[in-house]
């Protein structure tokens, strides 16, 4: 169990790095690009020139999408997803661990695997590969003039499912540890999922 808990800690550290640092920079970039879009649109109206471009508009929604794609695993780790817990809150740590263990194994893990499986072919084709595996010569682009390629943002869907799957595996390890009597893991999860009430 100690070896598995080391793996779980490594996955948790990676998830926290993505959720705390990478997404922070993406949020800042999204704000900058959004501000630029608004500024040049109004400036363009004022001076009667078209200054805005589909590149920046699409870049803004690509970045916005990436915040969510990269944040799913972080949400799972810190248990800040929507939960109807009028029963769950009154259960013992071990009972909660059993419910989370079974729920994660039966729902989240298969959902991630299915998501990756279903997404691989469209992403593969968007990079220009044909069904027989040969490269067709061009990647999928936005249908809008001056748009961005679609392949990179479609690839982020697979990355999101993979990160969520990794974190689900980490959670399963932690729940199994609680079930087998590792009380310190229950305390660790409680500390990670503590959300300060906003007043």
Q: Which stretches of residues belong to each language-model region?
A:
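Alpha-helical transmembrane segments and membrane-interface helix-loop junctions
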Residues: 1-199
